[in-house]
Swiss-Prot record:
The lineage of its organism: Eukaryota, Fungi, Dikarya, Basidiomycota, Pucciniomycotina. Mg(2+) is required for catalysis and for stabilizing the dimer. Its EC number is 4.2.1.11. This is Enolase. The gene is ENO. It comes from Rhodotorula mucilaginosa. GO terms for biological process: glycolytic process. HAMAP family: Enolase. Keywords: Allergen, Cytoplasm, Glycolysis, Lyase, Magnesium, Metal-binding.
Length: 439
């Protein structure tokens, strides 16, 4: 079935910045997608096209990207008359139309909006749910669907928060729950205990939430943050059922080959900056003391040596996730696999810019025995595509923020609906989240 109309406009994301929305029409109806945007972005990501006109939206307008959809992509794609259920063909057409390696001509945000809207239209054409269409495209293992463990970002530091804490995200991981819905309930209870403990210890305003719904108290060290989370898990009565994950986002505090854990202080003492191996020692201490099952971006995106050194020490003990390291880019993923730098991919569709390339990145990772964590961005919207993506590719783990703020809950609520719809045709990844694709 062909596409009859494509229309784009700008709408606003959860940080109040403009972003691209695309509506794609076929005989089956009109299908909408909204593109997210990140705060800490890797230098190797596909290009998100912003207008740069400082007189509007502080330079963050997306009028060019919207015009690229309406004036360039729409007429060309409609004329090409490609079957909307053939996602690979649509994405290939979009890539050729752009013609640059990083989607700089049309903008990854323009291309992705069309790619995701087409996937929704393709699912409707086949009369199947979006996650089933994605499973077909990705040639996922047949059998029961896998519902992901929700990694919930409950405490924020780094570039996502004020205070001195260098590490960006601390997540609770309800891997001991019997089902997704129970995992979400446990997460929400731990989160409420964490909020009240935080207010008690750091004052009322410390309960305010950051971009992704986590609390952002004025915490100095990772140990202090982890102690607070462990106390919340205990207070909720779930010790042993809830693990912890961290996203360090260490590229944000990598300077001159060293790591500055006091990077938010403009006068930080250079003599206290530490080397990759010293930072690795800090992680090893934390791994020994806390139930940490996953560490994302422990080192800077081009500090390959530090990644390989650390991974050789902790392989099999905890999952090491590449985000800024890999930026969902096949060339970077291949290098990370070959250098044994990590064993899991953080999958962000807007880092690469089409659904087909995102699925390819996941499949390349699975083939190497890696895990895949499907992720939101800090600038999110009400679009729930990544919920279906996570179920469709059997990722077994998803990162969509705290159980707070509607743009975060939109994804978690969508997985709740999928769980209900599938009933006994689905299993919860639980402790097997790292190898969920083969369950």
């Amino acid at each position: 079935m062909a596409i009859s109309k494509i229309h784009s406009r700008y709408v606003y994301d959860s940080r109040g910045n403009p972003t691209v929305e695309v509506e794609l029409t076929t005989e089956k109806g009109t299908f909408r997608s909204i593109v997210p945007s990140g705060a800490s972005t890797g230098v190797h990501e596909a290009l998100e096209l912003r207008d740069g006109d400082k007189s509007k939206w502080l330079g963050k307008g997306v009028l060019k990207a919207v015009a690229n959809v309406n004036d360039t992509i729409a007429p060309a794609l409609i004329e090409a008359n490609i079957d909307v259920a053939d996602q690979a063909k649509i994405d290939e057409f979009l890539l050729k139309l752009d013609g640059t390696p990083n989607k700089a001509k049309l903008g990854a945000n323009a291309i992705l909006g069309v790619s995701l809207a087409a996937a929704k239209a393709g699912a409707a054409q086949k009369d199947v749910p979006l996650y089933k269409h994605i499973a077909d495209i990705s040639k996922a293992k047949e059998g029961k669907f896998v519902l992901p463990v929700p990694f919930q970002n409950v405490l924020n530091g780094g570039s996502h928060a004020g205070g001195d804490l260098a590490f960006q995200e601390f997540m609770i991981v309800p891997s001991g729950a019997p089902s997704f819905s129970e995992g979400l309930r446990i997460g929400s209870e731990v989160y409420h205990h964490l909020k009240s403990l935080t207010k008690k210890k750091y004052g009322q305003s410390a309960g305010n939430v950051g971009d992704e719904g986590g609390v952002a108290p004025d915490i100095k060290t990772a140990k202090e943050a982890l102690d607070l989370i462990v106390s919340a898990i205990e207070a909720a009565g779930y010790t042993g059922q809830v693990d912890i994950a961290m996203d360090v986002a260490s590229s944000e505090f990598y300077k001159d080959g060293l790591y500055d854990l006091d990077f938010k202080n403009p006068n930080s003492d250079k003599s206290k900056w530490i080397t990759g191996p010293q930072l690795a020692e800090l992680y090893e201490q934390l791994l020994n003391e806390y139930p940490i099952v996953s560490i994302e971006d422990p080192f800077a995106e081009d500090d390959w040596e530090a990644w390989s050194h650390f991974f050789s020490k902790v392989e099999g003990k905890t999952q090491i996730v590449g985000d800024d390291l890999t930026v969902t880019n096949p060339i970077r993923i291949k290098k990370a696999i070959e250098t044994k730098a990590a064993d899991a991919l953080l999958l962000k569709v807007n880092q690469i810019g089409t659904l087909t390339e995102s699925i390819q990145a996941a499949n390349d990772s699975y083939a190497a025995g890696w895990g895949v964590m499907v992720s939101h961005r800090s600038g999110e919207t009400e679009d729930t595509f990544i919920a279906d993506l996570s179920v469709g590719i059997r990722s077994g783990q998803t990162k969509t923020g705290a159980p707070a703020r509607s743009e975060r809950l939109a994804k978690l609520n969508q997985i709740l609906r999928i769980e209900e719809e599938l009933g006994d045709k689905a299993i919860y990844a639980g402790k097997d989240f790292h190898k969920a694709h083969s369950l």
